[in-house]
Amino acid sequence: MAQVSINSDYSEWASSTDAGERARLLQSPCVDVVPKSEGEASPGDPDSGTTSTLGAVFIVVNACLGAGLLNFPAAFSTAGGVAAGIALQMGMLVFIISGLVILAYCSQASNERTYQEVVWAVCGKLTGVLCEVAIAVYTFGTCIAFLIIIGDQQDKIIAVMSKEPDGASGSPWYTDRKFTISLTAFLFILPLSIPKEIGFQKYASFLSVVGTWYVTAIIIIKYIWPDKEMRPGDILTRPASWMAVFNAMPTICFGFQCHVSSVPVFNSMRQPEVKTWGGVVTAAMVIALAVYMGTGICGFLTFGAAVDPDVLRSYPSEDVAVAVARAFIILSVLTSYPILHFCGRAVVEGLWLRYKGMPVEEDVGRERRRRVLQTLVWFLLTLLLALFIPDIGKVISVIGGLAACFIFIFPGLCLIQAKLSEMEEVKPASWWALVSYGVLLVTLGAFIFGQTTANAIFVDLLA
């Protein structure tokens, strides 16, 4: 029997002990990171975390469900109907779950605790930098989507409060979409985004969970007991072409992308074992699948091909139950934007410190000035783009391709490199099978990323 071992030499796997380079996803790179000592628990140590298995399932579900939910009915319409939408999600689920398991396996092998750290350690510097850039761009695009969602929900709420029909001309200046988004962003989002640390994640998580489940329940109820004034458009039963099916990929990738936050969750478990983690992510993805399918199917069948990219915009403004759903979504997004910005800012800060060769131990004044400048630039750019891109579907079509990188490409590369690092005399069939699967993941991810990004640029953005 060939002896199989994984190179666990931390000095060879790790890239650097610099905090800017190894910044935790939800921690500023400027904060000192205590190096792992010999007495510190490793990811495989049963005492390394406090999260139960059930708690891990809940956290992964919470990380998965989000703003992409509102775009799923339109994705079913794009895919060509209920059958195509279900088949696409079921087919994707296998790769989504396997990617999460691969990341946990590589986290144990490399002794790293965040997504970008795992990629850095397993795949090397170049791939690690690309991963960090992808995370920064992805969080930037998601922040734009959040601002668009705020505008979508405010339009409907303001229409009721001002007692004006949807799309009425000659509205007062203070009800203009650009003004309301800007006012909300400056009053609430910017002050929450500037601090160095964020302590409201638990409230944001609670709001996200409540809001997501409430929106799903309302969409299902409105399908079962529809309002008399709602008339569905054409109900597609088959895709116009096979390319139409792939055009729904960005929404599905964006909706199910929880891979970036999955590695810290895995390492926070009481028993971070790959087998246990496989059960956790399978249960979590089945729950997320049920929510997304319920929303997608019922929302699509309610409005048909006429469904809006933001499904809540398809409902009448006067509907009280839907208005409550809009309020939940706004509150959730107001607290989620600063968290996503914080993740992106941490990555940008790490890239900047490494590029400049700056030491982590800097005076507080320089760090504060740089943080405020980064926050203002990030905030103003996302706000400006959100004001002139009123369709959430156009944003998701772009960042959905990046989500495919986190689901397919980086886990595939990690699997290939992890298997290549094993010191074996004879390669068994399972070794070749796993390497081949890694190649399949990378190939499939590259195809989805290329196809969806090209389609987003030439069809959605330039249309």
Curated annotation (Swiss-Prot):
Reactions it catalyzes: L-glutamine(in) + Na(+)(in) = L-glutamine(out) + Na(+)(out); L-asparagine(in) + Na(+)(in) = L-asparagine(out) + Na(+)(out)
Regions that span the bilayer: 56-76, 82-102, 130-150, 179-199, 206-226, 240-260, 283-303, 320-340, 372-392, 396-416, 429-449
Broad class of where this protein is predominantly found: membrane
Domain of life from the UniProt record: Eukaryota
Topology term for the membrane: Multi-pass membrane protein
Pfam families for the chain: Aa_trans
Modified sites of kind Phosphoserine: S28
Cellular component annotations (GO), alphabetically ordered: axon; lysosomal membrane; neuronal cell body
Expression sites (tissue/organ): Highly expressed in the brain, including the hippocampus, especially in the granular layer of dentate gyrus cells and the pyramidal cell layer of the hippocampus, amygdala, thalamus, hypothalamus, in the layer of Purkinje cells in the cerebellum and the layers of cortex. Particularly strong expression in neurons of the ventromedial hypothalamus, basolateral amygdala, ventral tegmental area, and locus coeruleus. Not detected in glial cells, including astrocytes. In addition to brain, also expressed in the spinal cord (at protein level).
Phosphoprotein is among the record's keywords: yes
GO biological process, one term: glutamine transport
Assigned keywords, A-Z: Amino-acid transport, Cell projection, Ion transport, Lysosome, Membrane, Phosphoprotein, Sodium, Sodium transport, Transmembrane, Transmembrane helix, Transport
GO molecular function, one term: L-glutamine:sodium symporter activity
Assembly and oligomerization: Interacts with the mTORC1 complex; this interaction mediates the recruitment of mTORC1 to the lysosome and its subsequent activation.
Functional description taken from the UniProt entry: Symporter that selectively cotransports sodium ions and amino acids, such as L-glutamine and L-asparagine from the lysosome into the cytoplasm and may participates in mTORC1 activation. The transport activity requires an acidic lysosomal lumen.
Family as reported in the entry's similarity comment: Belongs to the amino acid/polyamine transporter 2 family.
Listed name of the protein: Sodium-coupled neutral amino acid transporter 7
Lineage of the species this protein comes from: Eukaryota, Metazoa, Chordata, Craniata, Vertebrata
